Amino acid sequence: MPITDHGQPPTLSEGDKKAIRESWPQIYKNFEQNSLAVLLEFLKKFPKAQDSFPKFSAKKSHLEQDPAVKLQAEVIINAVNHTIGLMDKEAAMKKYLKDLSTKHSTEFQVNPDMFKELSAVFVSTMGGKAAYEKLFSIIATLLRSTYDA
């Protein structure tokens, strides 16, 4: 299932949640390294996305050394971690992601297509598990929700 960012977000089955709960701790225990790898890969694939991060001072070839890049990578993975923590509280998860959508659309003016692209990089980095494809489709769709309203 490719990452989607329009329409009704998919629903995580109990099996999906179990798969995420079993594998996420292995990913998150090295969150600094893993989050930086995801963000750097995303910026490599979508160099224009760097324009959305005005605090990044490093040249494109030295992003891995920029403290602002490392901090943003951690912010992103911690938001994913928080979302995973809300998997059993669907209303709270939706509210959290819609609030992030509002912030990204009004305060940061992020191109909404980037949520889907970043989600796809996350999933490919995590081995493309179907449960993560569903999770990140939920994330991408709800982060885009304010833009489509």
Curated annotation (Swiss-Prot):
GO molecular function, one term: oxidoreductase activity
Globin domain segment(s): 11-148
Pfam families from the UniProt entry: Globin
Keyword Heme: yes
Keyword Transport: yes
Alphabetic keyword roster: Heme, Iron, Metal-binding, Oxygen transport, Transport
Binding site for heme b: 104
InterPro entries for the chain: Globin (IPR000971), Globin-like_sf (IPR009050), Globin/Proto (IPR012292), Globin_lamprey/hagfish (IPR013314), Mb-like_M (IPR044399)
Family: Belongs to the globin family.
Family annotation (PANTHER family): GLOBIN-LIKE PROTEIN
Further remarks about this protein from its record: This globin is the main component in hagfish blood.
Subunit structure comment from the entry: Monomer.
Name listed for the protein in its UniProt record: Globin-3
Organism: Myxine glutinosa (Atlantic hagfish)
